Regions:
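Active-site environment of divalent metal-dependent phosphoester hydrolases
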Residues: 69-74, 96-98, 143-144, 351-355, ...
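Core dinuclear metal-dependent hydrolase active-site scaffold
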Residues: 1-59, 128-132, 136-370, 436, ...
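A structural signal for short coil/turn segments at secondary-structure junctions
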Residues: 84, 131, 394-395, 423
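Hydrophobic/aromatic beta-strand patches that form the interior of the parallel beta-sheet core
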Residues: 10-12, 65, 90, 136, ...
Length: 445
């Protein structure tokens, strides 16, 4: 059917971490075509992740989105890659800032741990050795204001064609007619480059500004088709003043100027960074530098909107929320008919309390927030990572915290009280399998 599309999005129970899988499909002439994606794949407890992975029946992912490279969000990638083919990975660009954060987080008394060091030295090869065919880096917002919404695909005049950039279009190849075509485009893009690994050729490129993955009935479809399903990643900025202070402090430790641009870090800089972190005093000094930006080493983080590019009237949306949880897991559960949206918005560990990150984040997603049915609270339900200004813009959405049951402050009791006062639904996805949470929607004309 040209006039309908279905989606099933599931947050699997992996404890203190995250593992979301989405299926987007269309059925026409008794044939079904689908697109599959995941958001994050890790947990502090590896057994919890593997149990959640066992519950996932997929054999192939078109795209794996990674919010950031903290272990509890990505340490399950080897287990994931051993179970299913991962075609493409989208993650925050490993610029100088990201590389320093990852190196500091992955260092111990002997320096940077082997797997992290290998990833830093050649991230494209690292993913390629796990069977990934393409690696797409999304640059951190450097404007501090959020992308210009006039360039956003969903904001074009109804009958105008999509703004064209080189991008990458992925059509169904011979023998893969069951896959839906999709494309990834950005406001600004690097040239496509390739490297050779033992598993084959891997291509990579960097996208900046407004970035969107479009799952379409036809790769050349106009944006006026309301059933184009979009996956919109966004990596929030830091304030320029704070970045400048950090760069000066880090430059003193590394004894060379630290660039704060959003492009891929050079191998030369990475080599010096790894060598510096072998020294205990330098390691402590560099970690202290990062505290200028973040006290918990969780930034920057990629968020992901998954839903239609155009607003749809509620009568054109069919919902099915599935959870094995009893009423004790819910707070102010809304009747199903009051859930007005059909989209899912994941946030990783984004700091949506700070005005410096919240304002551009809201600017990027504001036109899509009315469509959000499920909102994943940042940083496992941390009270200091979310502002009421964000929560109040999605009053009917279900708020979800991905957190293990034994964590005292995830979700934080103060956040639960705030949600109570706002009259909003809340559910926790823990390591307990009945807490797995799914949203299925069908959009029809």
């Amino acid at each position: 059917m040209a006039g309908s599309i279905e989606a099933n999005i599931t947050q699997f129970a992996v404890g203190q971490g995250g593992f979301l899988v989405g299926r987007i499909w269309r059925t026409a002439q008794n044939a079904q075509r689908e697109f599959t994606y995941a958001f994050d794949c890790g947990s502090i407890n590896r057994e919890h992740f593997e149990t959640g992975l066992d519950a996932c029946a997929l054999s192939r992912l078109d795209v794996l989105f990674i919010s950031h490279l903290d272990l509890d969000h990505v340490n399950g990638i080897d287990a994931l890659a051993s179970k299913m083919q991962i075609d493409r990975v989208v993650l925050p660009c490993l610029d100088t800032l990201q590389s320093i954060v990852l190196a500091c987080e992955g260092s111990d008394d002997a320096g940077v741990r082997g797997s992290i060091a290998s990833l830093l030295r050649d991230p494209v090869a690292w993913f390629g050795e796990r069977g990934v065919k393409s690696v797409y880096f999304v640059g951190r917002d450097s404007s501090g204001e959020g992308p210009d919404m006039r360039n956003t695909l969903g904001a074009n005049p109804p009958d105008s064609p999509r703004p064209r950039s080189n991008g990458r279009s992925h059509k169904s190849r011979e023998g893969e007619e069951e896959r839906l075509p999709y494309s990834i485009r950005g406001e600004r893009e690097s040239a496509v480059q390739q490297i050779k690994t033992s598993r084959g050729i891997v291509e990579y490129m960097t996208f900046e500004g407004d970035v969107q993955v479009s799952v379409e009935p036809d790769v050349g479809a106009l944006v006026s088709d309301p059933f184009v399903w979009a996956l919109i990643p966004y990596v929030h900025p830091f304030s320029k003043i704070t970045l400048d202070v950090f760069a000066r402090a880090a430059s003193n430790v590394l004894k060379k100027q630290v660039p704060i641009g959003t492009g891929l870090v050079t191998k030369r800089f990475t080599k010096q960074l790894l060598a510096t972190l072998c020294n205990e005093s330098s390691r402590k000094a560099l970690k202290a530098c990062y505290a200028i930006l973040s006290s918990d080493n969780n930034l920057p983080s990629l968020s992901l909107y998954s839903g239609p590019v155009k607003p749809l009237h509620p009568t054109r949306i069919w919902h099915n929320v599935r959870s094995g949880q009893g009423p004790q897991f819910w707070r102010h559960r809304l009747p199903l008919g009051e859930i007005e949206g059909c989209a899912w918005l994941s946030t990783g560990d984004a700091n949506l309390s700070s005005l410096q990150t919240r304002a551009p984040w809201l600017k990027r997603y504001e036109q899509f927030l009315p469509a959000v049915a499920v909102f994943i609270l940042p940083h496992h339900g941390s009270n200091r990572h979310i502002h009421d200004d964000v929560l109040s813009r999605m009053p009917s959405s279900i708020k979800v915290a991905c957190a293990a049951t034994e964590r005292a402050k995830h979700p934080h009791p103060s956040l639960l009280r705030r949600l109570d006062l706002l009259g909003q639904s809340f559910v926790q996805v823990s390591e307990e399998q009945p807490s797995e949470f799914s949203l299925q929607v069908k959009l029809s004309g």
